Every structure is written in C-alpha cells, then in structure tokens.
Amino acid sequence: MRVYKTNEIKNIALLGSAGSGKTTLAESMLFEAGVIKRRGSVEAKNTVSDYFPVELEYGYSVFPTVFHVEWNNKKLNIIDCPGSDDFVGGAITSMNVTDQAVILINGQYGPEVGTQNNFRYTEKLGKPVIFLVNQLDSDKCDFDNIIASMKEIYGPKCVQIQYPLETGPGFNSLIDVLLMKKYSWKPEGGAPIIEEIPEEEMDKAMELHKTLVEAAAENDEGLMEKFFESESLTEDEMREGIRKGLVTRSIFPVFCVCAGKSMGVRRLMEFLGNVVPFVDDMPKLHNTRGEEIAPDSNGPESVYFFKTGMEPHIGEVSYFKVMSGCVKPGDDLTNADRGSKERIGQIYACAGANRVAVEQLNAGDIGCTVKLKDVKTGNTLNGKDAEWRFDFIKYPNPKYSRAIKAVNAQDTEKLMAALLKMRQEDPTWIVEQSKELRQVIVRGQGEFHLRTLKWRLENNEKLNVVFEEPRIPYRETITKKARAEYRHKKQSGGAGQFGEVHLIVEPYAEGMPDPTSFTFNGQELKMNIKSREEVDLEWGGKLVFLNSVVGGAIDARFMPAILKGIMDCMEHGPLTGSYARDVRVIVYDGKMHPVDSNELSFMLAARHAFSDAFKQAGPKILEPIYDLEVYVPADFMGDVMSDLQGRRALIMGMDSEAGYQKLSAKIPLKELSNYSISLSSLTGGRASFTTKFASYELVPNDIQGKLIADHEAELAKEAE
C-alpha cells in the first residue's frame, strides 16, 4: 500500500440509528473498492465491521470499526459507528477524529431519534453532513414523505442529489440531478447502467437540478455571480460549491442507496472521493492550550490515540490519528499525558479485524499499532519538537447504573482488574468502588450497554457476575438548631480519659453570618467566635466549625480532635447511615482534666454530643435530583409525561426541536433506576434522554419513614 499525502486523505464517519444499514453499507463499500471478494451480511455474522464475539452474539455493532478503501487515488478512512444510543461513545469518538459524517436514514421509518442525536453531535462539532436514505427496497419506504420530514426538521439546507424512480421491492433505478443521469441496476445489483434521463422525468429532474445549482452557488461569490448571469454552473463548479457548502454546513446533500444490493454505493463513493472535503480543507483543531494545529506532514510529530481495542492473541490494539508530522515504525515518542517514552512498532492501515502494514502515515491519516507499553485512550504522543496535548472528546453522562459483584467473592480483585481494562475500549461507562454505598457501581448509557458488558465479563474474562439494584447516595441534614453536651470519662487505674464538650448545631446556608448569640428555653447564650473552619465536604455540602469557648474551658489544642469526632459522625448520619451535610457546629463550652484529658477523650465526647444534637435538630433525608431532558415524538408525549409524573418528576418545560418534542424535568435519582427500559417500551425505542446531577432536595415524609425503617431492618439483619 502506498503512502498517501494529507491532501489525498478523507476521514468519514458512518452514522445512523440502529438498523439503518451502516454495517451493510460498509460491507458494500469494501466490496466496490475490491477489498473483499464477497459481501458478508449481519445475518450471516461474517461482516468486516462486526467481528467481536459480543457483536456476533447480539447482532448489533458495539464498537466503532475503522477500515479504509483506496478509491480513485485517494484514501478514504471510514469508521462504522454503532447505531444504538447505548453505544453513543463510538459515534462521538468517530465524529471527533473524522471530517465528514454520512448519516444513514432507514427508508422504512424516516428520520428517527438516533438520526436527531447524531445530527446534534455533528452540529456541536461543526462537521459536514451527507444524508443517505437507505433500504429503498423496503415495501414500507415512502421516499417523498421522508424528504418532507427532512426538510421540516433540517430546513432548506437538505438538497437532493438523487431521487428513486420507484421504492419497495421493485427499486432498481434513480435519477442523479448533479450528473443529470439515470442510474439503474439488475435485480441482483452489481455495476450500474448509466443512461440519459427519461423525458417524463426531465421536468422534475431539472427543477431539483436548479435547486442544487443555486445551493452550490451560494457558497462562493464567483459562482453566485455566474449563476445570476447564466443560471447554470459546470459540473466541476457545482462540485466546488458543494464542497464549500459542506465545510460551512450550508448544504446537506441527500443520496439514495440500497446497501444490501450495493445499488447506489459506487456513485456515493465517487462523490466521497471527488467532492467531500480533504483533511486540510477543514478548520484546524486546537490543542489543550488553545493553539491551532495544522495537519502538516512537515510539522512536529504528534499522534492522538482515540480508541483501544482488546483482541484475542494480540492484546491491545491502539488506534490513532496523526495530528501533525508523520509517523513511522521505530519512532521514539513521549507520552504527553503520562510522561513515559514509547517506541512505535509496526504501524497499520485499519481494515476491521485485519490490518495492512504501512511504512508511514502522514498528518491527517488514521491507523493503528500494537504492543505499546503505556498508552491509554485519549493520550497524545509527541516527537521531540512538539509539546502538545489533545483532549477534545467529551462524552455524555451515564444514564443507567447497576451494582456488580462476582458470584465467587474470591474473584472480586479479578473483576475490578477486568473492568478497568475493558474501560479502555469504551470510556462512556464508569466503574466506581463506592465506599459510601459499599458496592461496586457500573454506570453506562443504558440497559443494553451494561448487558453487553456483563456478557463480555462472563464469556471473555470467564467471570461469573451478577447485577443488583444500586443503593442511592442519600444525604442527611438538619432543619433547626439544637444543643447537646457529653462527658466522656473513663478511669481504670493509671491515667484515665476525660473530655466534656458542649455544642450547638444549626442548618448552614452559603453566606450566613457568624452567630452572636443563641436562645434556648429563654436563656441567652452569647457567642464569642475565636476561630472558624469551613470544610468543603468531599461528598458535597459544607461543615462550618466555630470555636466559641471562653475562659480556657477547653484548650485550643483539643479543637482538631473535636472536629475529627464531628467529621466521623457526619460520615454516618443517624437516620440511614448516609453522609451528613450543610451543618454549622459551635463549640461553646466544656471541661477538661489536667491529667486525664487527651485528644481521644475529646474526639469521643464530640462524637456523642454531635450525634445527640443532630437527632434533636429536625433531621431530614435528602435525595439526589437530576435534570432530565427527553426527546420524544409528539405522538408519545402524553404517555411520557404521565410516566414521569408517576415517578415524582417535576416538569420544567416543553419545546420543539428538530421534529421532536423536548421535555425538561427534575427527577429523583431513585426514579431513574429503570427509566431507559421504560422509555424504550413506551415509545418503541423512538425516544432518547440525557441526565445531569442538579441538587439534593428533601424527600417526602412518607418516603423518609420508609427509608429509616429499611435502614433499621438492615442493621438488625447485620446484627444477627
């Protein structure tokens, strides 16, 4: 394989909802380019893209698959992205390292929620978009209705390049209004027959051609002037105008294919090779210092690792994009994230499970290598003339959580090691060994996401594991002031233990002034604040600790021990054992003994005094509340709202966005437990949602009572 220059390389992501035909399209592209001799199929489990055992088991893409084709003296690096929202990380990763998105639309359904999600991501990243209506041979395909929906959602920027003469099982021909030709195929597919447009289609074709010419001309002043003069452009001028329109996202070309029979795929590839932007046509990327980095093969060497794959008999396969310079086997590079040195071994052009050895990859190119010592997903490796880091991939928050444990407790360490290793393949799920919840928590993008994780643990790592309901990280706080005192005294011969602490607790809110006095039972207690310590609690909220002891009742040297005793208590609230937060404590009196007082005595006295005061101060349980955004077709809005109201959600607003309804709400984390499953069931998989932590709020009294009872029952069971 020859070495391609930067201006000969195009990087393309195949996006679309699950079932829209991305993997089938990838197979047809490889076939048309002569990379494979026979097209595989998802049903036969023999495609180039879906080759991991878990993908073959479930019949869905789980990981993005990188491959390349050589087409008309150009190299097209193509990434086949998973369509399920559960594996959105693969699509996000791919969009960040490619320069062109091809979004497939299922001809049976038209634009779906996955279409919308992918388009939103391209919008955030400013990536060019081509729409591709697939499965035109389906008897459910209504092409005109699909185009109408697309124009309603995406506006006049959607410009048809092609339209089919017939849809359904009889589909075998289309009109291309860029080339002004008719393309047709034999029933089994194969090479197209290219003919003149039939007379009865000429009016429609000319109308669409004129729209396309105008859209292309709008992206260049010179082309616009010519269009005004002659109302026409040459084919090359149209290509140039469309290329500029793609870069600025002012035009979204619409193509037609039947990927299963390879009808229209060759024409699509010609367009990708001849029209879509090269790597160096796109805006420059920025490093973490905000500096623009051009894809210059003569520049300093810098390589960004965007994906790690774990393959049997090989181990880690590290996928990278050359950001600047060129990379060759034997190059000595420095890991900008970890400080370690790496020598690059053999480098490859990617071809799914296969690889093609190459002698060099230039700026903008994508490849992979194996057997690196200390490189993780997201790391940057630099040559001696570069000191750059790239960190531009931002993943969505997890939406579905489960506690996981090994059936055999002896496998716990092995389980954690396997989880940490597997996370290199997919950064969109998180593993946490929670001290607070006393569980190992895995958080992912949905039930299917974690189900495939479990399958891989059991089948690849030979670990027998179970999922459980994760505990909720409740918090405890107080709602009124209270005071308490406690004397710790212990005498058993020799030096004893003595410490007495008098303290007041009250709710704390940001910006509260320090108190000057308190009144209890008609008695006023004056406060003379001698020291103040504000603790930002690692679990959220604050503890404010004030020393108001006068007259030397307690030496200042014992105050750290008193604070430690209080902090120990705040780690185990009295209601449910949850962390406590947002409390102000004022130590105002106490006693000490000249011989028996020590730090332990005051720590224990403070612990008891604080616990007693907390229980008297109107203790309440707080629950985590999340911001929720649901994208749902209007037909399902009523059902979704009813379901949310049954989950104690507070509806904050509704809006229309790209043909869908966007519903905003605040909802307790407890009620999100199986929301992804319920939403999919309610909408037939046509809705999606995002979540983000918002705040902690008081739980209703009836729920507080149940939580306390459950905690007491758990303690009783542990004591048996």
Task: Give the location of each predicted region.
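Structural and coupling elements of P-loop NTPases
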Residues: 1-720
